[in-house]
């Protein structure tokens, strides 16, 4: 997928059906264990908990989730888990933290 296609996809997302972006956006926190590793089991349960409480959209990998402290692999894994456990609830994830544009595009591809 080209860089232009990714940009168009994001632009289309917000102009195509703006009414679909109404509702409650839950900003997902990242649960850490004592050793500072991510507790992915708790994260999956947390995603399900948010959905059960009526969130319309889940924002995984965001400022509230300590995204700047996570590795690219951890960010992708969190977004993947959120997508897996969210059912029909939309998941949004930040994928523009890498310094080089081509690295950002690669992270977006890994999250799709």
Question: Can you say where each PLM-predicted feature lies in the sequence?
Answer:
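Short, Lys/Arg-enriched N-terminal segments with co-localized hydrophobic residues
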Residues: 1-12
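Active-site beta->alpha loop and helix N-cap motifs at the rims of alpha/beta catalytic domains
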Residues: 10-112
